[in-house]
């Protein structure tokens, strides 16, 4: 358990505050005990019908401008605070802007199509993205694999969730993810502000931070979280 944040979460603001204090926070439980939104959230709020819980909070948190959200940890959802986004992106991108990664033969054509579509639009709903690039029956396959990889590499993130509405204007169902680049949400200058550091230096900075708030976690466990 963290030394700095042990309170349970009861609101989107509380979730954002936890992300800002931890710096990095997976959505689901993992090898590090207590280091997840799932464990910080009271069980009765996890899938409550009559009150908002973490599934509803993730949208406001993602669009708050205070944290990065997406499939960031072991191909599963999580948050990174605004303070740590530059080092996180520098480490995960390993010194490559997406164009440079493509030029060096380190990205697939499908990844390139998805990245360019999102970057070109600014923001793009997953439904429209699939339609635009023919990810439908009889068309392209592997959408989830590609979009998850782009998030893990920090080239793409989730900006918000858009919900269907009933005839009374009330949202319902699972929200449709709206994708964007981190540069679109936080600005190019912030995202690239750690580029002058070696990617391993960014990793060490993040390791030191997490070690200070998760003293019971091993270096191997922290490395696994940061590498994804």
Report the location of each language-model feature.
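Long, low-complexity intrinsically disordered regions
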Residues: 1-228
